[in-house]
């Protein structure tokens, strides 16, 4: 599996570091599409390559402005418009990558199922939904939701308990 972070941790545009990626920006789009297609072209014939993966919880970067993890804003979904731009760009990259390499599946890496409704609408050409899941003992409704709402295979790109107390040896 070969992963491109797709702007998750910021990027440099015209020599200026942008810590929070704005996926609707024309220069950002151009850079990310260029890098993703270059990756596909460079590695398409690599023996043992399972799939290409774009991103790493990029949906969380839509509202987390720094290194500190904050609560996900459930009521205030200002990030929804930004999410739509991001997932459209993911799909556009996948289409361009498939034009270069039709032999490998293309996946995105989402933080759990946040914005799954938008993923289903905007990422129709993605082959596999990669997801980082920290729900604890069970994956809950994850399989049912993805099957019903998106209909694509799921790849656990990370999983585990949300928090583990080393003293009590239990989940927090």
Protein language model features and the residues they cover:
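Catalytic-core region of carbohydrate-active enzymes that cleave or remodel glycosidic bonds
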Residues: 34-37, 128-172
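Active-site mouth of glycoside hydrolases
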Residues: 1-129, 139-140, 147-149
